[in-house]
Design a protein with these regions (language model features):
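Short amphipathic alpha-helical interaction elements and helix-loop-helix interfaces
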Residues: 29-32, 47-51, 141
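Phosphate/ATP-binding catalytic cores across multiple sugar-kinase/actin-like superfamilies
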Residues: 39-59
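A conserved beta-strand->alpha-helix junction
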Residues: 1-36, 40
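Mid-to-C-terminal catalytic subdomains of enzymes
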Residues: 56, 60-202
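Intrinsically disordered or highly flexible coil/loop and linker segments, enriched in small
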Residues: 4, 51-54, 144
Length: 202
């Protein structure tokens, strides 16, 4: 059984700027500030370069796993809670379906182009047909429990994490990749712009 290594990467601003044209080309036709922040995080992470316990490290793994789909299937976005507040679980169900329907055009193409630029293949476990079918068969209240304050999003996943002994992780609030990696702050203009604003001309 293989162990897991936490590879910590630190991308200097100058390096970010030097790769910006490449990232924009790969993510096009997506061109929003949010898309750029996500694409940049995926681009640098998929290089597999960084440090493990302070020692330089580069992975030779060719297959990457992506968590794409978990938010769309299990109500992980803030707008899902907003939909629930507006119209209860019926409104939430419609919002989840809308997000799931647009994954191919909004996310998959962008992510696949960016990740494959480093000669790696990506797998999407949450988008496996059986996983999607199973989650779609469940009542939405089993997937999201917004009566809880911060931890009602992705409720089913949090329950599973707790069952597997990942109690600490199960209690953490969600952080989007662009905020968890700080990629949203790499571009001075983008840091103060709305995520839906256009970052560049596609």
């Amino acid at each position: 059984m293989h162990g897991f290594r936490l590879v910590q990467g630190n991308v200097p601003y100058a390096e970010y700027v030097s790769c910006l044209d490449t990232v924009q080309m790969l993510m096009s036709p997506q061109a929003s500030v949010m898309d750029l922040s996500i694409a940049a995080a995926l681009f640098f992470a998929s290089r597999g370069e960084g440090y493990v316990d302070g020692v330089p490290y580069k992975t030779d793994a060719r297959i990457l796993l992506s968590g794409l789909g978990a938010d769309e299937l299990l109500a992980g976005y803030a707008r899902h809670r907003q939909a629930w507040r507006r119209g209860g679980y019926d409104a939430l169900t419609k919002e989840l379906q809308l997000d799931l329907d647009r994954i191919p055009t909004r996310n998959l193409g962008r992510d696949d182009r960016v990740l494959s630029s480093h000669n790696r293949e990506v797998r999407y476990p949450y988008l496996a047909r059986k996983v999607v079918a199973y989650l779609a068969s469940l009542p939405v209240q089993a997937k999201a429990y917004f009566e809880l304050d911060e931890l009602g999003d992705k409720y089913l996943l949090r329950c599973l994490a707790t069952h597997l002994g990942l109690t600490y992780a199960a209690q953490l609030p969600k952080r989007a990749i662009q905020f968890g990696t700080r990629s949203a702050k790499m571009d001075a203009a983008g840091a103060h712009a709305k995520g839906t604003a256009q970052a560049f001309a596609p």
